[in-house]
Structure formats: structure tokens, C-alpha cells
Amino acid sequence: MNFLVSILLGIIQGISEWLPISSKTQELIASHYLLSLDVSIAYTFGLFMEMGSIGSALIYFRQDVKRVFHDKFLLKFLVVVTALTGIVGVPLYVISDKLLQNAYNPSIPMIFLGIALIADGIYIRYSRSRTREFKNLSTKEMILIGIAQGIAALPGVSRSGMTVSTMLVLGINPEDAFHYSYLAYIPAAIGSVGTTLLFTRHHISYVVSLIGIDGIALAVISALLTGLVVIGFLLKIAKTKKVYLIDFMLGGIAVLVSMLGLIIS
């Protein structure tokens, strides 16, 4: 495999995982065209590459990871959200694998997500009562966040887009919404990789034989390093009052790209 392609795929993963766009879809499209992978194989490869993003999150949020077992509220949040993510996400992952084998078009859910992001940006821009902190979340609200994250198992649906938007709509301030959405990603992504190993081992064997361990390792490292930069950048923006601009921009991009995808297909 061309090492430049490995680096490019890693960069795509490292950027798209933390933006409110579907990293699975971006990796699916890129690996499909750059490596001529079958769509379902490309989807498996995208999930396999999440190891790089997991590494980014573990490094960036290492202090939060250390305090999980000393902070009962944070532990409860991660347990509840991860449990609901698994309950909702695992069946949807199995369904997704079938959908991708039957010409499923991920542009459709991306359009709805783009519209949701634009609406969320409008809400953030004109709301004057967004003062709640993460520690004020109720158990029911944690369940909603877990369900939202589980739905992101579907191709075309962004995990960070779903969780961040849900937390913002619940009134959580943008800085906390982005921060704890990214933290909740860690156990969910580990579970996602585990599910991939369990249900699509034959796909993974094919990907390894086609791309090679060195190519995969390079892509994972590239995703990890890119992710560290992107996480830091987005969290800095989330501290400002301009976070709604991210929603407007990415929502518009998601809608335009998805409509272009529908026209081409």
C-alpha cells in the first residue's frame, strides 16, 4: 500500500472524528475510492482505524481518565452513556453491515444531521440561558445522550455531532458539551472496535492482508497525531461565543456534500 495513502486516510480520520460530521462516512468514501475497497470492507476499515482516535482521546484527556474512579458523577455519566450506546448501537451496527451490502446511501442521514447542526447553531446563537454545567445533568438526560451516541452506529450519522448537539439542546454550555462528548467517545470507541472484531473478523483479515500491518500502523499514528491537534483546536473554539459558527459551517457542508452525493448516485 502507498504510505502517502495511509497518511491521508489517517488525517481524514483524525479530523473527521472530532467534527460534527460522520468520520465513518468520510473514511468509507476515501478508502473506497483510494483503495477500491468494497463498501462494507471500507466501513470495517474505518472502524478499525478508530484505534488512532482512541489514542488521541486517551492522551488528551488523560487527567479525566485518571479521575474517573474518584469522581462518582463522572463515572455514572460514562457508565450510563456507554451502556445505552451499546444497547442501541450494537443492533444498529449489525443492521449497518447489511445495509452497506445493499447499496445503502449514507448521504440521506447526513442531510438530516446537517439540518440539525444548522438548527442547533441558530439555537446557540440566539439563546440567552445556556448556563448549565455538565454536573447538572440528570440520569434521564444521560440516557438521552447515550441513545444519541448509539444512533451514530449508522453510516452517515456523526457521533460527536449527535452527542454535542444533544448536550447543547439540553442547555449544557458549549465547552462542557464538547469536552465530555469527547470523553464519552473513549469507552464507546473501544466497544465499537470490539464489536468490529466480533462480527467482521473475516473483513479485518482481508483488510490486513490487503493493506499490510505497516500501512495500517502508519494510518493509525497519523490519525492519533492529527486528532490531538484537532481536539485542542475545537475545545479552544468551544470556550468562545463563536461555537455556533462551527455548526453553521459544518451543517452547510454536510447538506451540500450529501445532496451532491445523492445527485451523483
Curated annotation (Swiss-Prot):
Its EC number is 3.6.1.27. InterPro entries: UppP. It is found in: Cell membrane. GO terms for cellular component: plasma membrane. Keywords: Cell membrane, Hydrolase, Membrane, Transmembrane, Transmembrane helix. Its main location: membrane. It is an enzyme of class 3 (hydrolase). It catalyses: di-trans,octa-cis-undecaprenyl diphosphate + H2O = di-trans,octa-cis-undecaprenyl phosphate + phosphate + H(+). The keyword Transmembrane helix applies. One of its GO terms (molecular function) is undecaprenyl-diphosphatase activity. It comes from the Archaea. It is a multi-pass membrane protein. The chain crosses the membrane at residues 41-61, 75-95, 104-124, 137-157, 180-200, 215-235, 244-264. It holds the Pfam family BacA. HAMAP family: Undec_diphosphatase. Catalyzes the dephosphorylation of undecaprenyl diphosphate (UPP). Belongs to the UppP family. This is Undecaprenyl-diphosphatase. It comes from Saccharolobus islandicus (strain Y.G.57.14 / Yellowstone #1). The gene is uppP.
